[in-house]
């Protein structure tokens, strides 16, 4: 299984609980996602002026980009209550009914990993989202009867890392779909600098840049790296985090200049050395690395693709010349036109 202790995993870890202090409290403090942020501000202002519930919102994007933070900000900007849960926690229709019937007018209900809701729960959610009603079956057999329960008008905010797993009826009920993208180095520098101020740690511009460059476009990882580099700076009695301290700390933590860790380098090296740079199927890679396919597709590969180290093709995974250069390996000779011919997703 993917090691949850990976410093650069975008998934939540136990030590990320300290991130709460680093999170922005409103849209004006939120760095990055400019278009999404601007549109959200318009929709929130309009709903507030009309004193109506905001349309249902769906946040789509890789882990660690701020979906939960934005959901909390939406509720805070609207001045309403906030309830949070996740798809796997809502095991049956009764669990969802208990959540919905306890919402006040215009409250925000946040469901993380909404793509993991069961079909039975989704069926109950549809009329709740559309008509603000619950249609429940009470009893069993001939004595069973349908009961309608009126709900307060609420806003459902869903978050998913895998939009393709959402059913069309569920996706279509979200009036405000918002896609979140990886952050630029400049945006992450601002996030790191703000985080250092919140933590009471001095940091230079080049120190913030060094951490930002290795944060894989992800604020959650930037905050995690900042906390670990701060430990190295404290141990060295340094007044501030500069590039030298950041480089030393991240090198000791095996996070290289491109933000790759040992798992990333192992993935790339396996394709390069064992399969001649590819193409190689994802199932083969899953077996070679003893990792589940989902972990490879959702956690390992997105950043490698973003950086231009990897292509997904109909024939399998294919390393780019950039990947061989990063690994310090000679690129094998390929058939003319083999690289870059296939831009689609792997089918197998």
From Swiss-Prot:
Residue segments, region Large ATPase domain (RuvB-L): 1-183
Swiss-Prot/TrEMBL GO biological process terms: DNA recombination; DNA repair
HAMAP family documented for this protein: DNA_HJ_migration_RuvB
SUPFAM superfamilies per the UniProt record, alphabetical: P-loop containing nucleoside triphosphate hydrolases (SSF52540), Winged helix' DNA-binding domain (SSF46785)
Subcellular location as annotated: Cytoplasm
Keyword Iron annotated: no
Function, in words: The RuvA-RuvB-RuvC complex processes Holliday junction (HJ) DNA during genetic recombination and DNA repair, while the RuvA-RuvB complex plays an important role in the rescue of blocked DNA replication forks via replication fork reversal (RFR). RuvA specifically binds to HJ cruciform DNA, conferring on it an open structure. The RuvB hexamer acts as an ATP-dependent pump, pulling dsDNA into and through the RuvAB complex. RuvB forms 2 homohexamers on either side of HJ DNA bound by 1 or 2 RuvA tetramers; 4 subunits per hexamer contact DNA at a time.
UniProt remark on domains: Has 3 domains, the large (RuvB-L) and small ATPase (RuvB-S) domains and the C-terminal head (RuvB-H) domain. The head domain binds DNA, while the ATPase domains jointly bind ATP, ADP or are empty depending on the state of the subunit in the translocation cycle. During a single DNA translocation step the structure of each domain remains the same, but their relative positions change.
Region: Head domain (RuvB-H), residue numbers: 257-348
Gene name in the database record: ruvB
Entry's Gene Ontology cellular component terms: cytoplasm; Holliday junction resolvase complex
Region (Small ATPAse domain (RuvB-S)): 184-254
Disulfide bonds: none
Species whose genome carries this gene: Rhodopseudomonas palustris (strain HaA2)
Documented EC number(s): 3.6.4.-
Predominant location: cytoplasm
Residues that, per the record, bind ATP: 22-23, 64, 67-69, 130-132, 173, 183, 220
Enzyme class: hydrolase
Keyword tags: ATP-binding, Cytoplasm, DNA damage, DNA recombination, DNA repair, DNA-binding, Hydrolase, Nucleotide-binding
Reactions performed catalytically: ATP + H2O = ADP + phosphate + H(+)
Signal peptide: none
Protein residues bound to DNA: 293, 312, 317
Residues bound to Mg(2+): 68
Family under the similarity heading: Belongs to the RuvB family.
Name listed for the protein in its UniProt record: Holliday junction branch migration complex subunit RuvB
Subunit: Homohexamer. Forms an RuvA(8)-RuvB(12)-Holliday junction (HJ) complex. HJ DNA is sandwiched between 2 RuvA tetramers; dsDNA enters through RuvA and exits via RuvB. An RuvB hexamer assembles on each DNA strand where it exits the tetramer. Each RuvB hexamer is contacted by two RuvA subunits (via domain III) on 2 adjacent RuvB subunits; this complex drives branch migration. In the full resolvosome a probable DNA-RuvA(4)-RuvB(12)-RuvC(2) complex forms which resolves the HJ.
UniProt xrefs under InterPro entries: AAA+_ATPase, AAA_lid_4, DNA_helicase_Holl-junc_RuvB, P-loop_NTPase, RuvB-like_N, RuvB_C, WH-like_DNA-bd_sf, WH_DNA-bd_sf
